[in-house]
Amino acid sequence: MSTGNVTTLRRPEAPPSLPAGTEAKIEHHARPAEGKVAFSFRNVTKSFGDKPVLRGIDLDVREGEFLAVIGKSGCGKSTLLRILAGLDTPTTGTVSKDPSNRTRMMFQEPRLLPWERIANNVSVGLTGIAKGEAAREQALGILDEVGLKDRAGEWPYVLSGGQKQRVALARALVAHPQILALDEPLGALDALTRIEMQLLLERIWRKQKFTAVLVTHDVSEAVALADRIVVIDEGRIALDLDVKLPRPRRHGTPEFARLEEQVLNQLFGRGDITGQ
């Protein structure tokens, strides 16, 4: 047994297109086949004082699945993520996962140590796992994955916001976790940097095959990245939706737009206005 809120949700005016040169051959990457479950929530509740935040959450997520959790501010999605990461405990119910599986978490703020150089910031993710030259080599390897190996000896203050989040992603991934919990990690980035980070995250997820759980307010981001989208409303799962689109995904296609509309309809309590 394993053992927050951000900006107000707003509907995007128009989903951004991928930058020139980022499109690739269409590949089908379906949800993982029925198989081993990475973690399960069973009737999980969480209250703070007399205020219920999660109400009877039942959820199974398979190994290698990319799950997006979306909902309005205060709905309980970040609390769910903190319970998964072991940073909080449920009031009632159980969370089951293999105790040998590492879980790491990435936040909206990079939370880098200003007194440590970039490589040492990444090595923090290896505390209790590796140290010395072995830790440095692993840190340099994952920095290479995120495109920042040449900045390993620099200080955090010289990096842009997007580069700092790349370092935070490297720190979360350096120990090769089986589960990566992402709490609105791209929310503070500008639109182009955000798309670049989405592409980077998807590429590394497909390579390392970890289970990803992304909390986001961005419906377009959820459809672009996830195998499956769960909408939380007032502490309950209101929608559990498979995203059966080929990767890489193209914003603005009719299929992409229909999925966005389905999620938005649930979030805003509307009937189906698409005519589909």
Swiss-Prot record:
Assembly, per entry: The complex is composed of two ATP-binding proteins (SsuB), two transmembrane proteins (SsuC) and a solute-binding protein (SsuA).
Residue numbers binding ATP: G71, K72, S73, G74, C75, G76, K77, S78
Gene that encodes the chain: ssuB1
Protein name (Swiss-Prot/TrEMBL): Aliphatic sulfonates import ATP-binding protein SsuB 1
Annotated family: Belongs to the ABC transporter superfamily. Aliphatic sulfonates importer (TC 3.A.1.17.2) family.
Keyword Membrane appears in the UniProt entry: yes
Main location: membrane
PANTHER family tied to this protein: ALIPHATIC SULFONATES IMPORT ATP-BINDING PROTEIN SSUB, TAURINE IMPORT ATP-BINDING PROTEIN-RELATED
UniProt membrane topology term: Peripheral membrane protein
Record's function text: Part of the ABC transporter complex SsuABC involved in aliphatic sulfonates import. Responsible for energy coupling to the transport system.
Subcellular location: Cell inner membrane
SMART domains (UniProt xref): AAA
Catalytic reactions of this protein: ATP + H2O + aliphatic sulfonate-[sulfonate-binding protein]Side 1 = ADP + phosphate + aliphatic sulfonateSide 2 + [sulfonate-binding protein]Side 1
Domain ABC transporter: 39-259
Top-rank lineage group of the source organism: Bacteria
Top enzyme category: translocase
Region (Disordered): 1-21
Protein source organism: Agrobacterium fabrum (strain C58 / ATCC 33970) (Agrobacterium tumefaciens (strain C58))
